[in-house]
UniProtKB/Swiss-Prot annotation:
Sorted UniProt keywords: Ribonucleoprotein, Ribosomal protein, RNA-binding, rRNA-binding
Gene that encodes the chain: rpsH
Subunit and interaction comment: Part of the 30S ribosomal subunit. Contacts proteins S5 and S12.
UniProt keyword annotation of rRNA-binding present: yes
Positions of transmembrane segments: none
Protein name per UniProt: Small ribosomal subunit protein uS8
Cellular component terms per the entry's GO annotation: ribonucleoprotein complex; ribosome
């Protein structure tokens, strides 16, 4: 069955794996998903990732990160801009929860966090929020 919203599928797979306390989760590969994974890794929300050949197609194997109590580092991850209701922010992007979390934006400069987009003075589509 085809996925109508690949970013929502990506978010759901990461959220479900964290709740189930899995060490890794496999996500169907695409360039966008790989860039999102690299961004989450840079910001410390996941341990690492590798691209491996699945049964038919390549997959991104995401190694999840947990705190010292065994709880997932990703407390909350939500899709903001959806296929039926797109959400855009201008260059004066608001902070997510007063700066505790991040917005991930798709901008003309590539995928950026809200802080990076504010410093570059660009806006874009708010893909999801993460805490």
């Amino acid at each position: 069955m085809p996925v109508t919203d690949p970013i929502a599928d990506y978010i759901t797979r990461i959220r479900n794996a964290g709740v189930a306390k899995h060490k890794t989760t496999d996500i169907p590969h695409s360039k966008l998903k790989e860039r999102l994974t690299v961004l989450l890794e840079e910001k410390g929300y996941i341990k690492s990732h590798t691209v491996v050949q699945g049964e038919k197609f390549p997959v991104i194997r995401v190694h999840l990160k947990y705190d010292m109590y065994g709880k997932p580092v990703i407390k909350e991850i939500k899709r903001v801009s959806k296929p039926g209701r797109r959400s855009y922010e201008g260059k004066d992007i608001r902070k997510y929860l007063g700066g505790l979390g991040l917005y991930i934006l798709s901008t003309s400069k590539g995928l950026l966090t809200d802080k990076e987009a504010r410093s570059l003075g660009v806006g874009g589509e708010v893909l999801f929020s993460i805490l």
